[in-house]
Amino acid sequence: MKQSIFRYEGHNYLVPFLIISSLFFMWGFAHGILEVLNPHFQESFHISKTMSALTQAAVYGAYFLMALPAGWIIKKWGYRRGVITGLVLFGIGSLMFIPGSKINSFYFFVLSLFVIGCGLTCLETSANPYTTVLGHPDKAESRINLSQSLNGIGWIVGPLVGGQLLFSGVNIAIPYALVGIFVLSVALILSRITLPDPRRAHEADTNGKIEEKPMHAMAFSFGMLTLFLYVAAQTGVNSFFINYAEESIHIE
């Protein structure tokens, strides 16, 4: 009989997996729409390209500052509460675009994006390993790959939807308000349902032995450097590609 990737020890984790996987799409969407904000803010607030890069600096700066606190939250309260914390911060930051559109302050939008970045940090740190325990351990790779595919779709849909809305005169608060309502609704759902504790599964797999000094592992150090360079290249290209397309290739 073919083994289900969502069933384990008599439990079916399909619904929780679908809920968690939807979050992969949402943070991909959040990153995708971020790239559209640069030219939008340049036009709306008459700021330079360099100044508009504060949008990326706010989000990815939050990743740098919030990474260790996110790990502390997970260690103390578990992955489930880490996901919920990330969703709440993500939702609050998104809803902050509503007063931001009234105040019409670029720096308030930057603050909103920083809060969103803090939420995304908690969310990504928690949700990635969460998918690995929502079913049979032997199928963990299949589940996380499936979830990550939705993240890629979010990256594609984000700029398409964002560009269509923002450059057609729609209030910038509308797409973010809808995202905020959705993620806060998911946070409420997750707070009401029972899910497994990934920490217990991890401790069982490692016999309670956890590497306390990962920086001493060369593979970890090189992996971290690779991620740093990859994100730097990706962000640098994505942030100003629309400007490049308009000014150099004359695409409108």
Predicted regions and their residues:
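Juxtamembrane intracellular "pre-TM" segments in multi-pass secondary transporters
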Residues: 1-14, 199-223
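Extracytoplasmic
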Residues: 15-43, 47, 127-128, 237-242
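Extracytoplasmic gate region of multi-pass secondary transporters
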Residues: 34-38, 216-252
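Central cavity-lining transmembrane alpha-helices of secondary-active solute carriers
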Residues: 54-72
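C-terminal ends and interior cores of transmembrane alpha-helices
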Residues: 88-103
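Helix-loop-helix hairpin linking two adjacent transmembrane segments in secondary transporters
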Residues: 103, 143, 147-198
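Cytoplasmic helix-loop-helix junction between adjacent transmembrane helices
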Residues: 112-149
